[in-house]
Amino acid sequence: MKTSATSFIPGSLVLAFCLPVVATSPKTLAIPEKLQEAVGKVTVNATTCTVICGLGFKEETVCEVGPDGVRRKCKSQRLECLTNWLCGMLHFTLLIGKEFKLSCLSPDILEIGQGAFRFTWRLARGIISTDDEVFKPFRASSYFIKFQSIQEYDSGTYRCDVQLLKNLRLVKRLYFGLRVLPPNLVNLNFHQSLTEDQKLVDEGLEVNLDNYSRPQHPPWKKKVAIAVGIGVAGGVTGGVLVSIVLCGRLSVIHSSASLETLQALLPKGGMLRKPD
């Protein structure tokens, strides 16, 4: 009995494994006629978003495709797109009294209309930071802030949040780092401080800066350098002559003092005689 029971169990297992194979043998499925004639809409082409952050647009082409694979009734449509709502920070350095404007929307998105968005501005006055804890509300409800005559007090970090009014979805956050300097503090003319070769490079031309030679100084600088050199040379020469004269006088005085000392040491009536 034990032997028959043992042989029955493996036989049952083999039969159990074979049944699914027989039950799932491939069969030809009949597709209904309605499905064979079905037509679907397929996106056949799409452009990238017009902006890399914030709300933008993209173009899509949608066609009807049937069982034969032929495209029919193709239409192009312009759709909103959002790849990333966080747009980083833009830095600006300005002089006091200049007119300036901050704008957190691109012209193409304004085609929808300013009324479709909600704009919230916040300010971290006097510092450049993206820490949300240092920002305080700033009174502005438009997509831009305009400074008629900017002052040092206006420096800091401005944050603009853009939301869709229909669902209050945040679609853009942009920071503006603003530095305001007095006009007599620094010369902001970067191009003026460049050398001739560097100006050519700045204009997009190829220049080998390894063979760069120092620029020629203006004529008035050469004259000043010559005058300074002559003055220094004259001063040194005069100092040497004065030193020679003083040394000569000191030698004469020292010689006279030595003769007087020797004369005092000789007996009365004695005189010094020059050697033959």
Swiss-Prot record:
It is found in: Cell membrane. The chain crosses the membrane at residues 226-246. Residues 247-276 are cytoplasmic. Residues 83-176 form the Ig-like domain. Its main location: membrane. Residues 25-225 are extracellular. Glycans are attached at N45, N211. One of its GO terms (biological process) is sperm-egg recognition. Residues 1-24 form the signal peptide. Disulfide bonds join C104-C160. Essential fertilization factor required for male fertility. Part of a conserved trimeric sperm complex with the essential fertilization factors IZUMO1 and SPACA6 which bridges sperm and oocyte membranes during fertilization by binding to IZUMO1R/JUNO on the oocyte. Forms a complex with IZUMO1 and SPACA6 on spermatocyte cell membrane required for fertilization. This is Transmembrane protein 81. It comes from Bos taurus. The lineage of its organism: Eukaryota, Metazoa, Chordata, Craniata, Vertebrata. The gene is TMEM81.
